[in-house]
Amino acid sequence: MESYKCRVCFKSFVNGKALGGHMRSHMSNSHEEEQRPSQLSYETESDVSSSDPKFAFTSSVLLEDGESESESSRNVINLTRKRSKRTRKLDSFVTKKVKTSQLGYKPESDQEPPHSSASDTTTEEDLAFCLMMLSRDKWKKNKSNKEVVEEIETEEESEGYNKINRATTKGRYKCETCGKVFKSYQALGGHRASHKKNRVSNNKTEQRSETEYDNVVVVAKRIHECPICLRVFASGQALGGHKRSHGVGNLSVNQQRRVHRNESVKQRMIDLNLPAPTEEDEVSVVFQ
């Protein structure tokens, strides 16, 4: 935790407001001392320097700091109220130091460096830390930049490769059916027309084959064959007339068979009213 110390009496306070109220009491006391002539201060400073060289060195450093701050405050145009208060505090601090040296005792915290040196060290540390962080960030940025450059190069290479492929494939038109490549779109169109013609011719041949097969089936269905003599006729009328002939022939054959049967039956029967046949007489003579 940062401690707030008074530069005059070296008391520590909790916050800056308490320190400011304490410094106002010193300012009221030092206002009367500032009205004295500056020659007395220089004489006292010379006496103090002759009596104590260490304190003379510190007081001279503090005076130089006060003079430099007063000069810088004069050069700056827009001075703030805090800056003016700081210069007054430094002057009062110098006068208090001179008084203490004249009285002949030293403060316990005389060897401690002033607050300005501590602030300078802290600012230097902050600057060093900032520089270190910036260097790290810069290194990371360089690395990321390299990666970005590599990515851009790869993208450019891929784009160039694609352009080369497009240049090689440019002016070539490929047929989707047979896979042939043509230089112009017109040639590809003519080639596609030939494919269409082939498709039409194939469709026609398929239709013809289908019609022929249907005709064959119809012809096969229209064949008129005689079941008796296995003769084929073009129409059913011819086949009917042929079948009638087969019916007439069958009738004549049946009649002949019937006549032959009747004759055989008649031969087997003996009629006593009729004379004996001559053949039988001859047979009887032979047996005698």
Curated annotation (Swiss-Prot):
Please name the PROSITE patterns in this protein's record: ZINC_FINGER_C2H2_1, ZINC_FINGER_C2H2_2
Keyword Repeat assigned: yes
Task: List where in the cell it is found.
Answer: Nucleus
Zinc finger region(s), C2H2-type? 4-26, 173-195, 224-246
An example GO biological process term is:
regulation of DNA-templated transcription
| Compositionally biased region (Polar residues) | 37-52
Molecular function GO terms recorded: DNA-binding transcription factor activity; transcription cis-regulatory region binding; zinc ion binding
According to the record, the residues making up region (Disordered) are: 20-82, 101-123, 189-210
| Keywords, ordered alphabetically | Metal-binding, Nucleus, Repeat, Transcription, Transcription regulation, Zinc, Zinc-finger
Q: Which InterPro entries match?
A: ZAT1/4/9, Znf_C2H2_sf, Znf_C2H2_type
Q: Does the keyword Aminoacyl-tRNA synthetase feature in the UniProt annotation?
A: no
Principal localisation: nucleus
- Name the domain of life this protein comes from: Eukaryota
Q: Which GO terms describe its cellular component?
A: nucleus
The function of this protein is: Probable transcription factor that may be involved in stress responses.
Q: What is this protein called?
A: Zinc finger protein ZAT9
Origin organism of this chain? Arabidopsis thaliana (Mouse-ear cress)
